[in-house]
From Swiss-Prot:
<keyword id="KW-0175">Coiled coil</keyword>
<comment type="subunit">
    <text>Homodimer. Interacts with myosin. Interacts with SIKE1 and both associate with the STRIPAK core complex composed of PP2A catalytic and scaffolding subunits, the striatins (PP2A regulatory subunits), the striatin-associated proteins MOB4, STRIP1 and STRIP2, PDCD10 and members of the STE20 kinases, such as STK24 and STK26. Interacts (via FHA domain) with STK3 (when phosphorylated); the interaction associates STK3 with the STRIPAK complex.</text>
</comment>
<dbReference type="GO" id="GO:0005789">
    <property type="term" value="C:endoplasmic reticulum membrane"/>
</dbReference>
<feature type="coiled-coil region">
    <location>
        <begin position="506"/>
        <end position="816"/>
    </location>
</feature>
<protein>
    <recommendedName>
        <fullName>Sarcolemmal membrane-associated protein</fullName>
    </recommendedName>
</protein>
<comment type="similarity">
    <text>Belongs to the SLMAP family.</text>
</comment>
<feature type="domain" description="FHA">
    <location>
        <begin position="28"/>
        <end position="85"/>
    </location>
</feature>
<keyword id="KW-0256">Endoplasmic reticulum</keyword>
<feature type="modified residue" description="Phosphoserine">
    <location>
        <position position="465"/>
    </location>
</feature>
<feature type="region of interest" description="Necessary for targeting to centrosomes">
    <location>
        <begin position="1"/>
        <end position="163"/>
    </location>
</feature>
<keyword id="KW-0963">Cytoplasm</keyword>
<dbReference type="GO" id="GO:0031430">
    <property type="term" value="C:M band"/>
</dbReference>
<dbReference type="InterPro" id="IPR051176">
    <property type="entry name" value="Cent_Immune-Sig_Mod"/>
</dbReference>
<comment type="function">
    <text>Associates with the striatin-interacting phosphatase and kinase (STRIPAK) core complex, forming the extended (SIKE1:SLMAP)STRIPAK complex. The (SIKE1:SLMAP)STRIPAK complex dephosphorylates STK3 leading to the inhibition of Hippo signaling and the control of cell growth. May play a role during myoblast fusion.</text>
</comment>
<feature type="topological domain" description="Cytoplasmic">
    <location>
        <begin position="1"/>
        <end position="819"/>
    </location>
</feature>
<dbReference type="GO" id="GO:0005615">
    <property type="term" value="C:extracellular space"/>
</dbReference>
<feature type="compositionally biased region" description="Basic and acidic residues">
    <location>
        <begin position="451"/>
        <end position="463"/>
    </location>
</feature>
Length: 845
């Protein structure tokens, strides 16, 4: 069964490694090389100190046909398109990766001791499905601009701002790569220029040698002509003097021309040294620009990370604010409901208190009225007792006499009725019977009232036990008790009125005494009921006061808590404002740094363009000067005739001057090395400053973490932060505007770089064409030089032969006059002419 394939290719800004082809049959571990696992082309193990041993995992999900990457608690982090997967050394959720993504393992780490930077692994990944088709690209995905985790999509999806920053960083990296290629091209062009200069020097030397040979031939021809002529000593002397004068004039002209050539050569060397210096300066500036670009990229990444962190913090704060607002609303609603309930309870208790006070006053008035009536009744009862005693004493005897008669038959009654007895006595007897019946009825009523009172007392005791229940039940029980008390008070009054009527109708002493006793008992019970009602009223008043005090205490405590919360909210507002000011200052400082860096980049670009233009002008001027020098040399060929010894002396002096120039160049090289050492020292100082800035950054980050902890602790107690959200949203909009301006500036810079690159490429093409032309010219000159050397050798051989012949002739002439002398001179002249004419023909073109 075929398996999915992942190809890791090295980026220019990465630690170097070979291209890896990894088959994803199972989850593949990405990490640092160890003794057991060495880097190979079919694994994801890298020889890099920045990576962890178990840095990350890559696998292919056959169900979803997607590729996933997970950071397994690495120390320096894993990045997908400049977005870190996890915070700190935490395990990240699996994140989807697409073909063409740029994956970074770790970050660049510098050692303080050796001051060596260890690069990280940056690679572009190409993903192929098991069927051989390439996975979808990042540009094909519309909804998700960056890879999202499986579980937490919203938490790890970066914003469009970070994606644009990543694109800008990619453009800058490509521009740096192009600059490196241009620098390499410039270096090759410089080498070609050096080669052409050497070739031109050799060609000049060949031309000088050719002119030298021609001058020798002319001299030899003149000598042959002079020897062939039969002249006297005076004429020979004159010719020798003229020849010596010509020789001196030629020497002076040659010396002047050589001086001019030397001066021009010195100027050319000086210009070349200046060009080399400008080249070194431009290279230094390019390195500085690269470093500044890297720093700006790092700062942009840090700003992007900070921006994403601030966005996440804002989201967390908004969520917490919403939760806090909901809790606050719930608490406020609960407080308002409790407040309303307490107010209603207080109002009800006050109303009940007023009602109870009114009832107490009414009961007191009724009690006073009943006391007055009871006193009046007591007086009447005393009068009635006296009357009844008198009547009972008179009637007691008559009743005893007539009892057997009453118990007798009806016949006796009939007889009595028929007899004309005393009617008044019978009426009195009947009235006594009625009174006895009334007394029995009264006793029954009294017993029933006693039973009802006992039941009421038991009910009151149960009600008193229930008074410890809530205030609503107390108030209802109190009202029922008051009603029962009123009924109890009204009942004895009614009974007293009935008893009055009965006592008025009845005049028995025993019944009156019993009624009086019952009335006294009822009065005592009524007084006790009044006392208990008063005690209940006092208890209710005490409970009301206690509840009022408790409510007041609760209100005071709530007011204090509200004040404390308001103070804490004010403190939180102040802290948030301070943090916002610090963030604004940091953002403004970073903006200033970016602007200054951009200005420096523009200045350096202008300087580089000026240097390139100066190089072009210098190159053109050098070419023109070379043409002039060639023309002058051609003129010197025709006019100059030199001797070998003088030329050798001039060559020696020229060599001495060259050695002096070389010594000067060495001194300049030593001076440049000293300047390099100074620059290295300055670089060390800058590195120390960078380390100090990093330490300050670490301290600032720790302070930020501490402030974040304080914010987290204060967020638990805060409930109102809506104003801060609006301010943060305004700052976010400002940041987005500034980011847009930065993007426009970066795009402009990229366009300028592209134009400069196109110009440089055109210049390189022109230089290549000129180089090809110079190569063709050099090849022709080399051929001519070889031909001239061959001719030179032949001529030197012939000249040696001629010299030998001349020496022999002179010796013979000194010894004997030789008759074949003119013939021999003519022969030598003819041979010289034959040899000289083709040389002139070759030299003339």
């Amino acid at each position: 069964m075929p398996s999915a394939l992942a190809i890791f290719t090295c980026r220019p800004n990465s630690h170097p490694f070979q291209e890896r082809h990894v088959y994803l049959d199972e989850p593949i571990k990405i990490g640092r090389s160890v003794a057991r696992c060495r880097p190979a082309q079919n694994n994801a193990t890298f020889d890099c100190k920045v990576l962890s041993r178990n840095h990350a995992l890559v696998w292919f999900d056959h169900k979803t046909s997607k590729f996933y990457l997970q950071d397994t608690k690495s120390s320096n982090g894993t990045f997908i398109n400049s977005q870190r997967l996890s915070r700190g050394s935490e395990e990240s959720p699996p994140c989807e990766i697409l073909s063409g993504d740029i994956i970074q393992f770790g970050v660049d780490v510098t050692e303080n001791t050796r001051k060596v930077t260890h690069g990280c692994i940056v690679s572009t990944i190409k993903l192929f499905l098991p069927d051989g088709m390439e996975a979808r690209l990042r540009s094909d995905v519309i909804h998700a601009p960056l890879p999202s985790p499986v579980d937490k999509v919203a938490a790890n999806t970066p914003s469009m701002y970070s994606q644009e920053l990543f694109q800008l960083s990619q453009y800058l990296q490509e521009a740096l790569h192009r600059e490196q290629m241009l620098e390499q091209k410039l270096a090759t062009l410089q080498r070609l220029l050096a080669i052409t200069q050497e070739a031109s020097d050799t060609s000049w030397q060949a031309l000088i040698d050719e002119d030298r040979l021609l001058s020798r031939l002319e001299v030899m021809g003149n000598q042959l002509q002079a020897c062939s002529k039969n002249q006297t000593e005076d004429s020979l002397r004159k010719e020798l003097i003229a020849l010596q004068e010509d020789k001196h004039s030629y020497e002076t002209t040659a010396k002047e021309s050589l001086r001019r050539v030397l001066q021009e050569k010195i100027e050319v060397v000086r210009k070349l040294s200046e060009v080399e210096r400008s080249l070194s300066n431009t290279e230094d500036e390019c390195t500085h620009l690269k470093e500044m670009n890297e720093r700006t990229q790092e700062e942009l990444r840090e700003l992007a990370n900070k921006y994403n962190g601030a966005v996440n913090e804002i989201k967390d704060l908004s969520d917490k604010l919403k939760v806090a607002e909901g809790k606050q609303e719930e608490i406020q609603q609960k407080g308002q409901a409790e407040k309303k309930e307490l107010q209603t309870k207080i109002d009800e208790m006050e109303e009940k208190e007023q009602e109870l006070q009114a009832k107490i006053e009414a009961l007191q008035a009724d009690n006073d009225f009943t006391n007055e009536r009871l006193t009046a009744l007591q007086v009447r009862l005393e009068h009635l007792q006296e009357k009844t005693l008198k009547e009972c004493s008179s009637l007691g005897i008559q009743v005893d006499d007539f009892l057997p008669k009453i118990n007798g038959s009806t016949e006796k009654e009939h007889l009595l009725s028929k007899s004309g007895g005393d009617c008044t006595f019978i009426h009195q007897f009947l009235e006594c019977q009625k009174k006895l019946m009334v007394q029995g009825h009264l006793t029954k009523v009294v017993e029933e009232s006693k039973l009802s009172k006992e039941n009421q007392a038991k009910a009151k005791e149960s009600d008193l036990s229930d008074t410890l229940s809530p205030s609503k039940e107390k108030s209802s029980d109190d009202t029922t008790d008051a009603q029962m008390d009123e009924q109890d008070l009204n009942e004895p009054l009614a009974k007293v009125s009935l008893l009055k009527d009965d006592l008025q109708g009845t005049q028995s002493e025993t019944e009156a005494k019993q009624d009086i006793q019952h009335l006294r008992k009822e009065l005592v019970e009524a007084q006790e009921l009044a006392r208990t009602s008063k005690q209940k009223c006092f208890e209710l008043q005490a409970l009301l006061e206690e509840e009022r005090k408790a409510y007041r205490n609760q209100v005071e405590e709530s007011a204090k808590q509200i004040q404390v919360l308001q103070v804490q909210l004010q403190k939180l507002h102040m802290d948030m404002e301070n943090l916002q000011e610090e963030k604004d200052t940091e953002i403004s400082s970073t903006r200033d740094k970016l602007l200054s860096a951009q200005d420096e980049i523009l200045l350096l670009r202008q300087a580089a363009a000026e240097a390139v233009s100066e190089r072009d002008t210098d190159f053109v001027s050098l070419q023109e000067e070379l043409k002039k020098v060639r023309a002058e040399l051609e003129g010197w060929r025709k006019a100059a005739s030199e001797y070998e010894n003088e030329i050798r002396s001039l060559q020696s002096s020229f060599q001495l001057r060259c050695q002096q120039c070389e010594d000067q160049q060495r001194e300049e090289a030593t001076r440049l090395q000293g300047e390099l050492e100074k620059l290295k020292k300055e670089w060390d100082v800058l590195e120390t400053e960078c380390h100090s800035l990093k330490k300050e950054n670490v301290l600032l980050s720790s302070e930020l973490q501490r402030q974040e902890k304080e914010l987290h602790n204060s967020q638990k107690q805060s409930f109102e932060l809506t104003s801060d959200l609006s301010i943060l949203q305004m700052t976010r909009k400002e940041l987005e505007k500034q980011v847009g301006s930065l993007k426009e500036q970066h795009l402009r810079d990229a366009a300028d770089l592209k134009t400069l690159l196109s110009k440089a490429e055109n210049q390189a093409k022109d230089v290549q064409k000129e180089y090809e032309k110079t190569q063709t010219v050099l090849s022709e000159l080399k051929l001519k030089f070889e031909m001239t050397e061959q001719e030179k050798q032949s001529i030197t051989d012939e000249l040696k032969q001629c010299k030998d012949n001349l020496k022999l002739l002179r010796e013979k002439g000194n010894n004997k006059p030789w008759p074949w002398m003119p013939m021999l001179a003519a022969l030598v002249a003819v041979t010289a002419m034959v040899l000289y004419v083709p040389g002139l023909a070759r030299a003339s073109p």
